[in-house]
Amino acid sequence: GDSLYGSHSPTVTSQLGSLCMAPALLMASYQPGVKIEERPLNRMQQTGVKPSLGEDKPKVPGILPFSVEALMADRKPGRDRDLSSPTGSPLAGTSHSPRVGSIAAGETPNSPISLGNRYPVGAIMQLPEETLLKPESPERSSWIQSPSFSPSPTRRMSPPACPLRKHKTNRKPRTPFTTSQLLALERKFRQKQYLSIAERAEFSSSLNLTETQVKIWFQNRRAKAKRLQEAELEKLKMAAKPMLPPAFGISFPLGTPVPTASLYGTSNPFQRQALPMSPMGLYTAHLGYSMYHLS
């Protein structure tokens, strides 16, 4: 007899091939993100062959996330669908009222609002006013009033403390020296600014003072003498500065006597006009002079 495949016509052979390809095409239709070409299914419909596996399961065409159909239908992929439900436990710190774009309590997941769209324009327009959070509602501004988001209050800049010199509370009172004691101390200081231990003990006993009082007085007197001497030297430096630049000088012809009138600025038709000058002896000073030196 003839073989199984040899006795059939080419039409029957193509029908059997379509039946073999049908399960693979149906399995590919369940893969997410894969769009099925309609050409093999059209061939099956034209030949009249109906797949046995496709009768009990509905056809779910997959849509790519960036395809034209997904953009026109305003959809997102299945993994980004809204997972929030009324029975789900809310996160800690979030409000229990429904937010804009979420599923309301009385709606089902199959409602037009919950088609995987978080913020569709049509769904927001169809929501009742009670589900929307108004700007003045306390639930909307609760996170703003929380201490973690509220800015810290500006600290007032306290005025800087006045740096006043505070004396110690246990400071000893100032020693009131008499006039005779001050004169004796000044006389002794002009003789000798530094006293030995024996001299200080003898001198303090003669003035009815303690050695510490005499020592402190001599220390203060030496500091005062140093300040006065520095002030005198500063005055001498200021007075010694010439009125003219150092490179500028007045020259006279050699062998001719210097007229006295030219030093004081008097006019002479045969001599140059001289600038007024003070006598040279005014600037001479004994820098080594000591004001406490006794002659």
UniProtKB/Swiss-Prot annotation:
GO terms for molecular function: DNA-binding transcription factor activity, RNA polymerase II-specific; RNA polymerase II transcription regulatory region sequence-specific DNA binding. The keyword ATP-binding does not apply. Residues 164-174 have a biased composition (Basic residues). Residues 141-153 have a biased composition (Low complexity). Its main location: nucleus. Residues 170-229 bind DNA. Residues 75-115, 134-175 are annotated as: Disordered. Keywords: Developmental protein, DNA-binding, Homeobox, Nucleus. This is Homeobox protein XHOX-7.1. The keyword Iron does not apply. Pfam families: Homeodomain (PF00046). The lineage of its organism: Eukaryota, Metazoa, Chordata, Craniata, Vertebrata. GO terms for cellular component: nucleus. GO terms for biological process: embryonic morphogenesis; regulation of transcription by RNA polymerase II. SMART domains: HOX (SM00389). Residues 84-97 have a biased composition (Polar residues). It comes from the Eukaryota. Belongs to the Msh homeobox family. It is found in: Nucleus.
